[in-house]
Amino acid sequence: MKQCLSVMRWQFGTWLGSARTVTAFLVFEPFIYNSSTRHIATLMFLGLMLLFADAPFTEQSAMYSLVRCSRVQWVVGKLMYILLSCAVYYIFSLAVTVLFFSPNAFAGNVWSAPFYELVMRDAAASSYHITVDPKLFMPVVTPYLAAFYALALNLGYGFFCGSLLFLINLSGSRVLGFAVLSAQHIISYLIRFKYLPFFISVFSNHGFSEDAGLPSVGFSCAYFCLFAAIIVACILRAVRHVDLKITVGTRI
């Protein structure tokens, strides 16, 4: 047992000189990594859908507000709630990652050496199956700007999903809304990895060597804004023809 404990102490002693132990990350890099990793992004998506599970929020206590405002004002208020909820959700996620890693991280606007190696080298991907994509963003984007882009794109995608769920649930069943949202999320990954024809989406990720052909962040944000405007217009049109009830048998 004495020899076993000696081996264990020696192994712990190697931590002091290991670059994996003492090399710090930038505080925003975990959030950037989470936003670009498929399984973590999907878990965040599921959490957001759970937040909007009761869309279009027509419970009895909330429906009394229709007595004091028009249907258009009611819809605008609900959409403002969805947008602000998305902002709180993703800002909270950013804050949690920053606080969790802050004891062993720095705040400078420069990429850390470990994260740079994970992104730019193939050794981590081949040995540990850890990948961060796309590779081309790191040389041209600062960490602070990358964190802002990740937050903005998450917010755009979250509002798109929340407003689409609101529209579908307003006109149909909640099961249909979740089915449509889940299908579009899965299809987006199939398109990204070439399981569907490229012409279906301009966002097809067709390999690291061709990442330069992907749309810019500005174009992606404009795309989200366009689809959000279309969905909002459809909601404003649909709400005029939907039966909204405060109590059973009472139509507003």
Residue map of PLM features:
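Active-site micro-motifs of SAM-dependent methyltransferase domains
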Residues: 14, 63, 81
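Hydrophobic alpha-helical transmembrane segments
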Residues: 1-56, 148, 170-171, 175, ...
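Residue-level recognition of transmembrane alpha-helices
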Residues: 78, 181-182
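Hydrophobic alpha-helical transmembrane segments of polytopic
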Residues: 86, 180-181
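Membrane-helix interface segments
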Residues: 70-72, 172-178
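Amphipathic cytosolic juxtamembrane alpha-helices at the membrane-cytosol interface
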Residues: 70-81
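Transmembrane helix boundary and interhelical loop/hinge segments in multi-pass membrane proteins
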Residues: 51-67
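Secretory targeting signals
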Residues: 24-55, 79-166, 170, 203-225
